[in-house]
């Protein structure tokens, strides 16, 4: 196999929390005002953005040519955000949900798109206090992008399991490793993408969704893997935001290698193993429910296997691509940590009282936290 190493980018959505109680607080305007006053985010190699609610804030990295650049962007941006948040009596927390009772008086970000979403989707939009991690991999050719998307669907269950970081919701243990997934699944355009025969087939689907009023335009597709309209990339959206920088770095490297593998398989004409949509949907739900703590469904073989074995199948498949990047070590460290000590959801459940859980997440959000 021969590989080209594509550029990548990453987005992380963070919680803004009260330093005493750990509860979400709507201080995004104040934090962004402080960042602008201090000269903006250019030196952090990222863009800082609003999200749906004012207790959320998002970073989007510049285009990165290496995992070292990803690490630098995440580290510098988190430090900048933490400093700006603390100057406004706020802490930054990186996890898929906040464990404490959800806000009853949270302010919506004043943006036409967000207001339209809330007007249409009502309570599921008002309750959308969830925080994800999105990875972009360069993809100039959208026809190729469709086939890569088809080939990457098989990995969605294990990607869901390894990034699970949201066991608590509204003050209770939900029983899920990723309850964020279940909250997000309520949205009609969320979930795994279908298999598309071609770019024309994909575009026909988009046209049908617009025609029937399901979406305003293509940018309202929120599938777990999608082709964004603004940038020439393929975007992976299934993950909870992870707490430690090194987890995100390893995950970005994993996604890049998955895309490289899919491109190589497409160029070789390797047949795609058909996956039934119902099997894939169940496999993803099962991964969100149990994380790495139970057996998972391999959607290609339709067999239930240990989670560690499904992760091993992924690592074996992408090994040639990882070696081609020269940056296998962060990905291998991430995989080893998952086997040794579990996911972010597992760490949260070992954290004791919910206020202590938030405090631990806040502490690990600081870029100095290392894998252990």
From Swiss-Prot:
Pfam families: GCS2. It catalyses: L-cysteine + L-glutamate + ATP = gamma-L-glutamyl-L-cysteine + ADP + phosphate + H(+). The keyword Transferase does not apply. The lineage of its organism: Bacteria, Pseudomonadati, Planctomycetota, Planctomycetia, Pirellulales. Belongs to the glutamate--cysteine ligase type 2 family. YbdK subfamily. Keywords: ATP-binding, Ligase, Nucleotide-binding. This is Putative glutamate--cysteine ligase 2. One of its GO terms (molecular function) is ATP binding. ATP-dependent carboxylate-amine ligase which exhibits weak glutamate--cysteine ligase activity. InterPro entries: GCL_type2/YbdK_subfam (IPR050141), GCS2 (IPR006336), Gln_synth/guanido_kin_cat_dom (IPR014746), YbdK (IPR011793). HAMAP family: Glu_cys_ligase_2. Its EC number is 6.3.2.2. It comes from Rhodopirellula baltica (strain DSM 10527 / NCIMB 13988 / SH1). GO terms for biological process: modified amino acid biosynthetic process. Gene3D superfamilies: 3.30.590.20. The keyword ATP-binding applies.
């Amino acid at each position: 196999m021969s590989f080209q190493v594509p550029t990548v980018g990453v987005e992380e959505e963070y919680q803004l929390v009260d330093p005493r109680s750990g509860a979400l607080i709507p201080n995004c305007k104040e934090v962004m005002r402080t960042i602008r006053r201090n000269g903006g985010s250019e030196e952090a190699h990222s863009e800082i953005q609003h999200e749906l609610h004012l207790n959320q804030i998002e970073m989007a990295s510049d285009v990165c040519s290496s995992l070292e650049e990803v690490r630098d962007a995440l580290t510098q941006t988190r430090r900048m955000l933490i400093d700006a948040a603390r100057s406004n009596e706020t802490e930054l927390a990186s996890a898929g949900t906040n464990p404490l009772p959800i806000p009853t008086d949270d302010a919506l970000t004043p943006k036409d798109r967000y207001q339209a979403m809330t007007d249409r989707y009502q309570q599921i939009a008002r309750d959308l206090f969830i925080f994800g991690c999105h990875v972009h991999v360069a993809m100039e050719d959208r026809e190729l992008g469709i086939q890569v998307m088809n080939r990457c669907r098989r990995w969605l269950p294990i990607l869901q399991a390894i990034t699970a970081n949201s066991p608590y919701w509204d003050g209770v243990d939900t029983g899920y490793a990723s309850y964020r997934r279940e909250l997000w699944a309520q949205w009609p355009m969320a979930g795994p993408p279908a298999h598309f025969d071609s770019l024309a087939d994909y575009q026909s689907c988009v046209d049908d969704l617009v025609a029937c009023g399901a979406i305003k335009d293509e940018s309202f597709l929120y599938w777990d893997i999608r082709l964004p309209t603004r940038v020439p990339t393929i975007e992976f959206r299934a993950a909870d935001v992870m707490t430690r920088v090194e987890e995100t770095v390893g995950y970005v490297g994993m996604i890049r290698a998955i895309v490289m593998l899919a491109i190589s398989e497409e160029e070789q004409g390797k047949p795609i193993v058909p996956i039934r949509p119902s099997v894939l949907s169940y496999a993803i739900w099962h991964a969100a429910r149990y994380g790495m703590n139970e057996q998972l469904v391999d959607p290609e073989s339709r067999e239930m296997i240990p989670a560690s074995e499904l992760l091993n199948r992924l690592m074996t498949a992408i090994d040639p691509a990882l070696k081609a990047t020269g940056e296998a070590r962060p990905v291998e460290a991430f995989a080893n940590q998952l086997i040794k000590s579990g996911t972010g959801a597992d760490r949260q459940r070992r954290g004791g009282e919910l206020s202590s859980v938030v405090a631990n997440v806040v502490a690990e959000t600081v870029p100095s936290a290392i894998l252990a």
